[in-house]
């Protein structure tokens, strides 16, 4: 019996297994003479055991019978060498307005903004002055790559359907044609198949093309997804790593310098991270008051975009719940506006 992407199948115990894992435990585990289970990311974000996998005792480390890592694949000419570019800003202004009152704070980086203000990563992903410079970097790199490989293409991973439409409009404003494919797209697989052999330069995806989809001409990726798990991040990066010829030896991924994603990027050379491929005791998830990745009631709208460069755009955030400010016994919502200076900086992480 052969399994691909075995990490989707969870569980050693039927009570802690998912539906796919239960089928393996009930129908395969004691019947197959030999099993071959494959995965490029052999761990699960919920920390559950992978079905049929073996773990050391008492450490709980995954025991692999054979490893063929990214470095091996690059050496053999099977995969491209990843180049990851993180976009940051050295002067981010946050303006808080409440009625006639306003206050301004400056942050030296996006990490500081996210760590010390109510602004969330997902809200930043909808800011035109985050979307545009990341797309522009990807577009410039794709232009360069197509000088050598004329059919090279780019992938943009979006957060949800409206976000994908916003990104598509931005690409069109740059003179680029693109396709949009989401988990709601009728005949989505046909759209992907058509793009695979077309001359279209860009495809914008939501919930698609992150795993198991082979489009070898993809060589550039702009990561604008709100998902910040290492499994998803590596699966997306894998979409641009497939090498097809002598001259396409590099893959490029562009993203915001968000601390969690930066940590994933910095250890992409580690094929089996020790803190991930470990069997842990699984607990029922509880409320985490620190997490602000998807604030309830958050509304986002673009307010007057000024200028055409990298600065001048502002984004308003109506933050509710824990961010309500009380004045005279009446709750009112502060409005936060973020603006970026032209002092963008790029950090390049090169692997192998």
What are these language model-derived features?
Residues 47-151:
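Interdomain helical connector at the RecA1-RecA2 junction of SF1/SF2 helicase-like NTPases
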Residues 1-37, 41:
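SF2 helicase catalytic motif II
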Residues 106-194, 345, 349-352:
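Conserved helicase/translocase motor-coupling segment
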Residues 177-283:
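Conserved RecA-like P-loop NTPase helicase motor core
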Residues 124-126, 130, 141, 260-352:
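Long, largely alpha-helical accessory region at the distal end of helicase-like NTP-driven motors
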Residues 1, 19-27, 31, 51, ...:
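Alpha-helical scaffold elements adjacent to nucleotide-binding pockets in ATP/GTP-utilizing enzyme cores
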Residues 40, 159, 207:
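Conserved H-loop
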């Amino acid at each position: 019996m052969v399994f691909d992407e075995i990490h989707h199948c969870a569980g050693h115990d039927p009570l802690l297994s998912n539906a796919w894992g239960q089928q393996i435990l009930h129908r395969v585990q004691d019947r197959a003479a030999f099993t071959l289970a494959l995965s490029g990311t052999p761990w699960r974000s919920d920390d559950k055991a992978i079905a049929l996998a073996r773990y050391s005792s008492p450490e709980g480390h995954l025991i692999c019978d054979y490893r063929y890592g990214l470095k091996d694949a690059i050496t053999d000419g099977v995969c491209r060498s990843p180049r990851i570019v993180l976009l940051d800003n050295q002067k981010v202004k946050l303006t808080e307005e409440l009625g006639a009152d306003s206050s301004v704070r400056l942050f030296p980086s996006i990490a500081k903004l996210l760590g010390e203000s109510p602004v969330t990563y997902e809200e930043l992903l909808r800011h035109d002055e985050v979307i545009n410079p990341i797309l522009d970097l990807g577009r410039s790199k794709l232009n360069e790559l197509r000088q050598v490989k004329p059919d090279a293409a780019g992938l943009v991973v979006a957060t949800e359907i409206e976000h994908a439409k916003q990104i598509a409009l931005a690409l069109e404003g740059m003179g680029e044609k693109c396709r949009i494919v989401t988990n709601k797209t009728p005949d989505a697989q046909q759209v992907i198949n058509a793009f695979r052999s077309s001359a279209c330069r860009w495809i914008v995806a939501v919930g698609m093309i992150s795993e198991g989809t082979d489009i070898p001409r993809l060589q550039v990726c702009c990561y604008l997804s709100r998902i910040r798990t290492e499994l998803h991040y590596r699966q997306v990066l894998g979409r641009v790593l497939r090498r097809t010829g002598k001259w396409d030896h590099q893959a490029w991924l562009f993203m915001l310098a968000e601390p969690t994603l930066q940590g994933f990027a910095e250890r992409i050379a580690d094929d089996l991270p020790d803190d991930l491929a470990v069997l842990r005791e699984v607990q029922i998830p509880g409320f985490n008051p620190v997490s602000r990745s998807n604030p309830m009631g958050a509304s986002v709208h673009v307010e007057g975009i000024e200028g055409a460069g990298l600065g001048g755009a502002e984004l308003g955030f109506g933050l509710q719940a824990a961010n309500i400010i009380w004045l005279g016994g009446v709750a009112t919502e502060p409005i936060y506006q973020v603006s970026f200076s032209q002092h963008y900086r790029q950090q390049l992480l090169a692997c192998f």
